[in-house]
Each structure stands twice: as structure tokens, then as C-alpha cells.
């Protein structure tokens, strides 16, 4: 193996650039040539491929987003798209690929490996919904961003004795909602993975108001319903002065935290070393503080396990 490619795919996440930096520098330090692939699998098929040197990534560790750009390209699930991508890899003499992204990106990495081009998947998504890793690249930063925003919302909520329903990202995973809800002192946290009772939440908010609390906060994961929809449901059980707020795409931005920078660096380095060992079709993650790797196929048969004890903790803290 002499030459590797790097691409970022799907939704962007803080720390992706730090991962690109790590892959590039470790690969070059081990005598490999590195090529960046712009716009994910769409750019691979289009041949948007260029050489990377250490100086090209020197400024990236603290920069959010992805300087390789990203795009969703469902056509890569089809044989025709895969063969077009393989043709571009052959044309540029690329022997292996590091793919940074979510579960859809892992499917692409697996297909490249099946076609004879070893590929390693790195978990780059704020959703933290990838099995066999305790954290994904971007998750910690997204939580910090959401916490900072909700802290500000609490300021205005207290000034007007209002209840705020706040939507956070995460698709069908409630990890951001749980972690941020506990950190922000939410009265309730609502996630897709666990049942909830709007009437019970309404009663809890009433009790808090009666005890003298000057604000209310419900954190709702986007996979449950919109903040407006939840607000409408809540109003059926009480005459609340309530507002809905959607944090949205701000959670994908912001300077990566220390945790995300270090995680991205560790996983990027491990990806290169796995490729140097001739391995492919693997997903790299962090488990109990140690860098691990699993067959990508295993991820498709497993589901992410959230820290649902946080819900009980929050229920105890909000009484």
C-alpha cells in the first residue's frame, strides 16, 4: 500500500477536520501518500480528488465542519455508483480509503472493501448513534453548544416565568437530549427510545411552579416530535405560558472541544495503522477509554446503547 484517500460523508460534525489532520499526518509519517476526496462519495464518483500534504492540514485541529466538504450520495448504494467510485480510485492509484461519517458512510466503506479497496470507518456524527463506540466525533461539542444555548434560554424563561420546550438534534437517538437535559436542569427529558407521558410532565411542571420555581424546561429529542407539536400537547393539560425553541444546525458548528479533538486524533491514527496492517472493512471506536475496532457488518446487527440511567438521574434531580 502506497497511497490512501480520505473522505467525509453525511452530516458534518465538529472534529471531522481534526480526524482528517490525524489521518494525513500519521499516514505521511509512515511513508504513505495521501489524497483528499471532496464531497464524500459524490466527489469520489466525480473524481474530485487532490493530494494532501502535512502543511495542508496544519490549521485544521480547531476548525469545525469539514474542509473536504460533505454530501449525501444515496446512489453509492447501487453497484453502478460503486463501480464508478472504484474506477476513480484506480485512476488515481489509491489503494485504501478512510471514511469519516455516520452509519450511511459505513455502508460505503464496506462496499469499497468488498471491491478490494480496504476501507476504515470513523464515527463522525453529532448524534452519537453508532454502536461499539462510547462517543462519536462531534457529540461532545454538540452537547456543549446545546448546553450553552439552553443556559441562555433559561435566563429569559426565568425573567418571564415561562416554560420552554427545546428541540435538540440526534435523529432517533436521545443521547444529546439526555446529557444536555441533565446538565441544564431540565424538568423533563423526552427521547425516542423510552415511553413518556405528557400529562405526567405537565403535572411535574405545575408542582415546580407551585413550589416557587420561576421557569420550566423540557428537552425533546428531534426524533420524538417538534417542539411546537410537544407544546400543543402540553397545553392540553394546563394553562402554561410556554414557548417552543428549535436549536437546529447550530449544534453541528462551533470549535471542537478538547474531547472531540483528542478522540478524532486517536481514531484517525488507529485507522492508518489498521490499513498498514492490511486490514479493511472495520469501524474504529472508543470503548471504556480504549481505542477498538469491529467488523462494520457487526455494527449493522447491533444498535447503539444509550446511558438511560441519565433519565432516572434527571427525574430524581428535578423533584
Swiss-Prot record:
Function per UniProt: Catalyzes the phosphorylation of D-fructose 6-phosphate to fructose 1,6-bisphosphate by ATP, the first committing step of glycolysis.
Cofactor dependency: Mg(2+)
Gene (UniProt): pfkA
Keyword Electron transport: no
Source organism (scientific name): Lactobacillus delbrueckii subsp. bulgaricus
Recorded GO MF terms: 6-phosphofructokinase activity; AMP binding; ATP binding; fructose-6-phosphate binding; identical protein binding; metal ion binding; monosaccharide binding
Binding site for ATP: 11, 72-73, 102-105
Designated name of the protein: ATP-dependent 6-phosphofructokinase
Active site, per annotation: 127 (proton acceptor)
Cell compartments where the protein resides: Cytoplasm
